[in-house]
């Protein structure tokens, strides 16, 4: 059995903690067979546990405990990932979704998508990454008082270009620079921008969507000092035809929405700056979680 989960890019500027997209980088978890102890083979670095301390297995345990179910065996697993760690592309969320599905398959829980999303939001705390990782495409979601409501929609046709810096930025560190509260006036302004962003995405108006992404009042202005590449890439985007540029998740990845016919030019112009990092031309993943050789 093989579980495949896409990377994600959250917030899209003003859609803080509620809007995300799935993109075509993947985490894969393969069940190799039963084992005396839980064991995970991976090449993700020595700081990533290979036993029950791994997020994959702590998630599995949380699901089994929630459902009051126990497994009769332990398993040898293989985990491979194209998703850069701690870069704002949902690496932890993809593992959480994989862990939920692993529990679903091994314990034959037959969970619905809504049940999986509820569990994921309880573990992660907000839906912006876990929802598109599970469902694919563009997802707009809200979790209030433990209840998650969501809409899945096709993302407007365009190219995506991600600049992934070589340095990590943990979400907890990126959240420390955010204010504890906004004034009522600030909240109304930020909300109105997010509303227009959402409407523009749902009506395929990328010009307006790009403007609203860059007008965010919730988080980007506070985090910009942590990601010096953001402003430079935004300026390059303005000069060479990008629809918009935003900080992916908590950063440090910067995402550009680009007309298909401008992708090559923008890639060349960014490469000319010799920034320390990698460029990834990406596409929307419209499938979300996939399971090969499912037990169901």
Swiss-Prot record:
Keywords from UniProt, A to Z, are: Amino-acid biosynthesis, ATP-binding, Cytoplasm, Kinase, Nucleotide-binding, Threonine biosynthesis, Transferase
Q: In which pathway does it act?
A: Amino-acid biosynthesis; L-threonine biosynthesis; L-threonine from L-aspartate: step 4/5
Q: What is its EC number?
A: 2.7.1.39
Cellular location(s): Cytoplasm
Q: Name one Pfam family in it.
A: GHMP_kinases_C
User: In which domain of life is the source organism classified?
Assistant: Bacteria
* GO MF term set: ATP binding; homoserine kinase activity
At which positions is ATP bound?
A: 84-94
Which top EC class applies here?
A: transferase
GO CC terms on record?
Answer: cytoplasm
Task: Give the catalysed reaction(s), semicolon-separated.
Answer: L-homoserine + ATP = O-phospho-L-homoserine + ADP + H(+)
Q: Which GO terms describe its biological process?
A: threonine biosynthetic process
**What is the role of this chain?**
Catalyzes the ATP-dependent phosphorylation of L-homoserine to L-homoserine phosphate.
Q: Which family does it belong to?
A: Belongs to the GHMP kinase family. Homoserine kinase subfamily.
Q: What is this protein called?
A: Homoserine kinase
């Amino acid at each position: 059995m093989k579980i495949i989960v896409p990377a994600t890019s959250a917030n899209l500027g003003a859609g803080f903690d509620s809007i995300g997209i799935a993109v075509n980088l993947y985490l894969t978890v393969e069940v190799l067979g039963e084992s005396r102890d839980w064991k995970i083979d991976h090449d993700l670095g020595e700081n990533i546990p290979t036993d029950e301390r791994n997020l994959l297995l702590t998630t599995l345990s949380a699901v089994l405990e929630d459902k009051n179910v126990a497994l009769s065996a332990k398993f040898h697993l293989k985990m491979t990932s194209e998703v850069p760690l701690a870069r704002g592309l949902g690496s932890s969320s993809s593992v959480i979704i994989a862990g939920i599905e692993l529990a679903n398959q091994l314990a034959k829980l037959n969970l619905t998508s809504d049940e999986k999303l509820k569990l994921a939001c309880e573990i992660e705390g907000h839906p912006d990454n876990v929802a598109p990782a599970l469902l694919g495409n563009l997802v707009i979601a809200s979790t209030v008082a433990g209840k998650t409501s969501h809409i899945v929609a096709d993302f407007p046709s365009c190219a995506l270009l991600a600049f992934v810096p070589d340095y990590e930025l943990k979400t907890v560190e990126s959240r420390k620079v955010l204010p504890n509260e906004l004034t009522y006036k600030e909240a109304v302004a930020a909300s109105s921008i997010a509303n227009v962003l959402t409407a523009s995405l749902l009506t395929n108006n990328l010009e307006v969507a790009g403007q609203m992404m860059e007008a965010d009042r919730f988080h980007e202005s506070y985090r910009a000092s942590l990601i010096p590449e953001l402003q430079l890439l935004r300026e390059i985007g303005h000069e060479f035809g990008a629809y918009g540029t935003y900080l992916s998740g908590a950063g440090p990845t910067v995402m550009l929405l680009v007309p298909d016919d401008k992708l090559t030019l923008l890639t060349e112009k960014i490469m000319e700056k010799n920034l320390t990092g990698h460029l990834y031309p990406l596409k929307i993943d419209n499938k979300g979680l996939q399971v090969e050789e499912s037990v169901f």
